[in-house]
């Protein structure tokens, strides 16, 4: 658990990293979270007792707790109960997810104030190429978010030569505009911080040799995205 995160939702936030993920994204920087095993075992009530210690910081900054991963949706019973207890304690809740769980989303979203939705790609073909999995489950999750009427911040990783073209950004914007209650779109630059983990774990890193995205290029992509989200240059 990261106690005072500043980039995983509004305000000062505790970030709870949960084990397990079915996706094998080419740019994943946390391969150590793929397996459901490992990490620290803790009960929802015990976790929320730890989170309560930072309640004054959450309140003053407009923050709260963000459940991330891995993919937190793969532990639905734990997640729903932890979110419920957070809400009872007056802690604002946020879910950082790619939307690929077991289809059990209603109880989770009932206690979620904000979804940070990681859009891997906007076409089935591109999604399969990036993640190794079909797009079906994440679309089910989007439908559940729509039904629950939970606001959403969209995030998307921009990789040089893969997802940084103007055509891609415009297509992404068209897709994002179909999503429910999108309040913000953040383009994240591809980085190399997780590459060493692959070497340590004896895994092949499929983007070996691809450079990190420059901040200048990321800003240019973000500017185009912002214009498209306003209805400009989106064709």
Across the structure, where does each feature detected by a protein language model lie?
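Short glycine-enriched, charge-decorated loop/helix-capping segments at active-site entrances
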Residues: 32-36, 128-134, 202-210
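Short secondary-structure capping/turn segments at boundaries of alpha-helices and beta-strands
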Residues: 1-4, 13, 54
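Canonical Radical SAM [4Fe-4S] cluster-binding loop centered on the CxxxCxxC motif
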Residues: 6-42
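Auxiliary Fe-S-binding modules of radical SAM enzymes
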Residues: 1-5, 160-235
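Conserved AdoMet/S-adenosylmethionine-binding subsite of the radical SAM
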Residues: 52-64, 68-69, 73-193, 199-200
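Conserved alpha-helical substructure of the radical SAM core
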Residues: 31-61, 65
């Amino acid at each position: 658990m990261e106690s005072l995160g500043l980039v995983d939702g509004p305000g000062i936030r505790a970030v709870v990293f949960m084990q397990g993920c079915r996706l094998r994204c080419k740019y994943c920087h946390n391969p150590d979270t793929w397996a459901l095993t490992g990490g620290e075992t803790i009960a929802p009530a015990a976790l929320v007792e730890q989170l309560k210690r930072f309640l004054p910081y959450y309140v003053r900054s407009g923050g709260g707790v963000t459940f991330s991963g891995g993919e937190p949706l793969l532990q639905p019973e734990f997640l729903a109960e932890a979110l419920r207890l957070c809400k009872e304690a007056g802690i604002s809740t946020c879910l950082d997810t790619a939307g690929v769980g077991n289809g059990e989303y209603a109880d989770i979203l009932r206690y979620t104030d904000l979804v940070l939705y990681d859009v891997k790609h906007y076409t089935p073909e591109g999604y399969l190429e990036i993640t190794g999995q079909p797009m079906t489950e994440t679309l089910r999750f989007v439908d559940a978010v729509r039904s629950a009427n939970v606001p959403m911040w969209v995030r998307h990783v921009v990789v040089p030569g893969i997802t940084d073209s103007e055509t891609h950004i415009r297509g992404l914007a068209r897709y994002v505009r179909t999503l429910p209650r999108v309040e913000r779109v953040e383009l994240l630059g591809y980085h190399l911080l997780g590459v060493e983990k692959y070497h340590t774990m004896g895994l092949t890193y499929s983007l070996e040799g691809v450079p990190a995205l420059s901040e200048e290029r990321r800003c240019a992509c973000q500017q185009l995205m912002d214009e498209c989200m306003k209805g400009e240059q989106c064709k």
